[in-house]
Amino acid sequence: MTQRPMKKRKLLLFPLLGLLALTSLFSCGEDRWKEYYPLTGRDLWMDSLMREVYLWYEDIPASKELNYFQDPEAFLKSILSSKDKNFSTVDTITDAPLPSYGFDYTLYKVATSDTTYNALVSYVALNSPAEDAGLERGDWIMLIDGDSITKKTEERLTDGGTRKLRIGKYVIVKNEESQEPAEGDADTETGESGDTDNDNNNNGNNNNDNDNDNGNNNNDNDNNDNNNNDEEEEEDEGIGVIQEIGDVTLPAVRSVTEKAVYEKRFILYPGYKIAYLAYNSFTAGTAENSEEYNDELRAFSRQCMQKGIDNFVLDLRYNAGGEMECVQLLADILVPADKLESPFAFLQYNDKQSAKNRDLILDSQLLQGGVNLNLSKIYIITSGTTAGAAEMLINCLKPYMTVILIGQSTKGEYVATETFINPKYPWAVRPVVCEVFNSEGEADYSTGFKPDISVNESSYLPYYLPLGSPYEILLNTALGVITGAIELPEPQAGTTAVKSFATKKNVRKGLIVK
């Protein structure tokens, strides 16, 4: 919800609010304003803005204690409150996403070497060079252009031209066929036919469907074995190894625009109709279509209604926040029908901006062609990346429905930021402007939400699979909870991550929940 008139008013306050800070620019009666302003103007603007809109403005040091000759990041850090856990940020203004290969990864040391690594692909952006190459979540990169991954060669994974990658898969080697973690027969369907997001993941998901068909008998047998021969199973855990499967050509880096709706899927078990949504950002749309992603949510809600969905798994493991209206829309889709029009959240600003304090409701008008699913329970997959708007959704749904969290603790960002831009400087400042409470006045999740069922997916590498696969460990856990048949495989030893890399996502404008 961009407050543009307010932004302009704040910029006009600069000459007055900056006067106190300018005393250091006069020496022995000599006016040195013109000499120093090009070096200090940007920091002075940031200082005046923060003293007006920052939620914790009272904690900003006195002007005489500040250095206005610093770069923007250093200056912002020097004025932030101790309550601000890197929620407020400043960054350059970019019209296009930074070029990248479009995948994230985590490094693991090779067992036989102290200096070489394998890279586990943890995320593949849609319509990216990585997806074009056929990379999938759960793939292992073993070589880059024929070279081992080392501290010197790792940079080739993040930037550059065309690369050749040696790919492997993590498998458990043992005498008996490996167990599949899912129980029962599961059929999966993608979302709306012709949907670009679904098509982009079809290769991996078709393989998963085949696994469903071919693995069920083995799975049932294994379950019986588990019930009758637990001790024998413990003795035959097997060894995890990475098996080479071939080379792929990775196209050169290019600008990659992240899609908010990553994967939509329907999973049908006997007696259960389950919807799965991997939602990676609370973003309404694109520059070309401002409601593109919201409309995808609305269309998916209609599909869920048509299929008679009675359980919903919302995957927010990669969702680091976004726009407040998107939170309201998704909540409108999920909550019990009789809760529509009820209070949803309360925004509390600082005392200088108290006129902006306001209530948000579960506004059915936001549905605009979407439908309410009248759910009483929601299963949400979380991680340490889950933050901001994603946490707001969790907090604000809790008064109205049962929220079951699966995965890891969330980040603990309980405030909202707003983007401010001064045309004179190519920088965007995003200070914390308000605190976000649910309808019961609760906002105490600064340490994050702890999961009801804690699962560290890196401890189950055989099941570190593309999002939407019913065998992927976190989704599989959710399915097990829903069907009452949860049974986790034993964690594998010796899988300690060394380093993780994530591509830089675009910064959104407007009121962002962090």
Locate predicted features.
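Bacterial N-terminal signal peptides that target proteins for export
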Residues: Q3-P15
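Secreted, disulfide-rich extracellular signaling modules
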Residues: F14, G18-L22, C396-P399
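Flexible, low-complexity junctional segments that flank or bridge functional domains
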Residues: G29-N311, T495-K514
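C-terminal "post-core" interaction segments
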Residues: Y272, Y276-L277, S281-E292, R298-A299, ...
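Short intrinsically disordered, low-complexity coil segments enriched in acidic
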Residues: M1-T2, Y400
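A general structural signal for short secondary-structure junctions and capping/turn motifs
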Residues: R4, I93-D95, E155-T158, I267-L268, ...
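C-terminal motif of bacterial Sec signal peptides marking the signal peptidase cleavage site
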Residues: S24-S27
